[in-house]
Amino acid sequence: MKEKKNIPTTQSLLSSFDGSRKVYEKGSRPDILVPKREIALTQTVTQAGMIQNEPIRVYDTSGPYTDEHAHIDVTKGLNRLRAAWVEERGDTESYEGRHVKPEDNGYRSRNGSHQHIHTDFHHKPLRAKQGACVTQMHYAKKGIVTPEMEFIALREGLSPEFVREEVASGRAVIPANINHPESEPMIIGRNFHVKINANIGNSAVTSSIDEEVEKMTWAIRWGTDTMMDLSTGKDIHTTREWIIRNCPVPVGTVPIYQALEKVNGVAEDLTWDVYRDTLIEQAEQGVDYFTIHAGVRLRYIPLTVDRVTGIVSRGGAIMARWCLAHHQENFLYTHFEDICEIMKTYDIAFSLGDGLRPGSIADANDEAQFAELETLGELTEIAWKHDVQVMIEGPGHVPMDKIKENVDKQMEICKEAPFYTLGPLTTDIAPGYDHITSAIGAAMIGWYGTAMLCYVTPKEHLGLPNKEDVREGVIAYKIAAHAADLAKGHPAAQKRDDALSKARFEFRWRDQFNLSLDPERAMAFHDETLPAEGAKTAHFCSMCGPKFCSMKISHDIRNQSEEVKKEMEKKAKEFISGGSQIYSS
């Protein structure tokens, strides 16, 4: 008997955080409604009375899952938010698309045992009409401010024209495949909020479709800006379809993983035709950006021989093995213009993979890493000629003193295309805590100009992350990204910090919890020692107690100072009313 598969459940996510509600900021047209999370604040108690604190609105990535008025059926997918915008431009056409094959899900025949859950995903793919280009970069270069750009401007608190200029210049990308209309437009660029990405996906050893969909909804709840499906086991196509149809943020993939599954895991058997078919398959599903390791060139491979950890990128290692087996140049490099044609047909952004990134501190900033970067700069300019959007992937494992060099070189070589880095990890000695070792590097590299940070979970180097690991990784990277925004002086970045600091000083405990990145954990830690409801208004916590709380003492000093000030003012008035005489006769 076949194992019964569960329908992915999102019931636990259909509510907002305590003290918050979903609100929408209206644009210039009725269908531009930009989601934000509004955090209600309690009043400040003073000796003179109560003072109202205005609510704080924060950037929100959770989609309709935290909207109490939304109806969600994961077997049907989310509402097609951008469908009308794409259609009204008049430069796309629908078509039948390719048929799903057994090998798309990792099976050799249609008799393969795969996970099947009934869905109502009626998704007929779109493509650009003959001779048309449908990329956001193309529109931006023509001076067109698209609805996507206006949506982003409202999200970021900037002007639509500024968004258009950044996309036109290549300094920012809007990952928005025309076949992923469910996504809420967002932007990746160093002059915007630093973004984070969360990786999910099954492996040949563990996980299932429902687990991965739940991880996706969990990650966006905690704040991931994009999602990468890195599935390498069975049911890759089906898992990806479920994720994309239910995902309100851009979805990226590494197509070489699925292409390898189609040739039974034998890298030497990969061909351009297999890879091209995989690109089109994923493009039709709606993948918003592809990691493509076109910079791993045959002549660079010997540069990795003396490394401590060799080639640590899965995609990089696959292509290096293919190049050596055939003693030919990387077919992703030789067919790069062909790939550009596919990308511009669906508006898929390049995430040019760093297949030779350092996998250890000892290998950081070496010849192999920077040789590949030179090729990525070359490929960036080719893609831009096709009006295809590009971001550049970066390391990896880099000690703190070598981080800035990575950003400086990338900016120069890749003409300021957005940088997207994995960490970097700043030390190699902390398995189980690499969300911390990497968040240190992520905060620094974000400050220096990296546009998006790929999260690392506590399971890095140890195993496939579960739901709780995803939460840990996302929160660690939200901290890093926000710290970078503060350091760069991003408009409004400090507003939430100031609100929380004020709530902390005024002992408004619930406001402190609600304003934090992880309200549930903040309250749980507080309640471990002071669970009573009265403790939520107490002027101390269990760390210092009522007599040693520095903030309580500060309040006392302020009150005393106010009394002294009033007494001094009283004496001054008496002095003046007495004729301002210093001595009396």
From Swiss-Prot:
Spans annotated as Disordered: 89-116
Bound cofactor: record note: Binds 1 [4Fe-4S] cluster per subunit. The cluster is coordinated with 3 cysteines and an exchangeable S-adenosyl-L-methionine.
Enzyme class: lyase
Reactions this protein catalyses: 5-amino-1-(5-phospho-beta-D-ribosyl)imidazole + S-adenosyl-L-methionine = 4-amino-2-methyl-5-(phosphooxymethyl)pyrimidine + CO + 5'-deoxyadenosine + formate + L-methionine + 3 H(+)
Protein EC: 4.1.99.17
Binding site for Zn(2+): H397, H461
Entry protein name: Phosphomethylpyrimidine synthase
Stored InterPro entries: ThiC (IPR037509), ThiC-associated_dom (IPR025747), ThiC/Bza_core_dom (IPR038521), ThiC/BzaA/B (IPR002817)
Keywords: 4Fe-4S, Iron, Iron-sulfur, Lyase, Metal-binding, S-adenosyl-L-methionine, Thiamine biosynthesis, Zinc
Stored PANTHER family: PHOSPHOMETHYLPYRIMIDINE SYNTHASE, CHLOROPLASTIC, THIAMINE BIOSYNTHESIS PROTEIN THIC
Pathway entry: Cofactor biosynthesis; thiamine diphosphate biosynthesis
Any single GO BP term: thiamine biosynthetic process
Known function: Catalyzes the synthesis of the hydroxymethylpyrimidine phosphate (HMP-P) moiety of thiamine from aminoimidazole ribotide (AIR) in a radical S-adenosyl-L-methionine (SAM)-dependent reaction.
Highest taxon of source: Bacteria
GO CC annotations, alphabetized: cytosol
Biased composition (Basic and acidic residues): 89-107
Cofactor or coenzyme needed: [4Fe-4S] cluster
